[in-house]
A protein has these predicted regions:
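General structural signal for secondary-structure boundaries
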Residues: 1-2, 41-42, 96, 112
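Exposed alpha-helical structural elements
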Residues: 3, 12, 20, 41-48, ...
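Classical nucleotidyltransferase
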Residues: 1-37
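Extreme N-terminal tail/first-helix region
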Residues: 33-53
Length: 183
């Protein structure tokens, strides 16, 4: 399934496949398991990230990435880091509840009962862990991804940029978004 292929990319497919099948896949580098996604140049990172999304989500991810880069330029933050955070911010969003919880277990991510009941919130935490461990991203990018859904007090400029970019990117349609985009 698509989810199994995604979990192979996150190096967390043990519960989806027979151990001998998984060993064969990894030994032969099938389904991209032999690829190194750490510290990729941006265009390759973009390709890798978008390959993990549902096609309907791709315009949002690209819009968030471009909006984050634009906001970084406007507010004097690192544009490259903002773009990297934007392209990876929803990298685990397509995963099911069981896959999200499996990633939480793999990465030692503590979850609340509320998060387990509303598992779509977990993608920010699992996405940050994947950004760190699979893509080799720096702490600033990972932290921005971690907080892009809930926010927190005393956010860094990059964290604020990603939070806002996700909220106001061009695919978002709600009353007041156009005014927000002009600020």
């Amino acid at each position: 399934s698509t989810e199994t292929r995604r979990m192979l990319r996150f190096r967390c497919a043990e519960q989806y496949l027979d151990p001998k099948v998984l060993e064969y896949i990894e030994a032969h580098g099938l389904y991209g398991t032999g690829e190194n996604w750490r510290s990729l140049p941006f265009e390759k990172l973009k390709q890798a990230s978008l390959s993990l999304h549902d096609p309907k989500r791709v315009p949002h991810v690209i819009g968030c990435c471009e909006t984050a880069a634009r906001l970084a330029r406007r507010w004097g933050a690192d544009e490259a880091l903002a773009a990297r955070a934007g392209i990876l911010h929803d990298v685990t969003k397509a995963l099911s509840k069981s896959a999200q919880l499996l990633l939480c277990e793999k990465y030692g991510i503590m979850t609340s009962e509320f998060e387990r009941e509303n598992y779509k919130l977990l993608h920010s935490k699992t996405g940050a862990a994947a950004a760190r461990d699979v893509f080799g991203e720096c702490d600033a990018v990972c932290s921005a991804i971690y907080w892009h859904t809930t926010g927190k007090a005393d956010m860094t400029v990059l964290e604020k940029i990603l939070y806002l970019a996700d909220y106001m990117e061009p695919c978002r349609k709600f009353d007041g978004v156009e005014k927000l985009r002009t600020l």
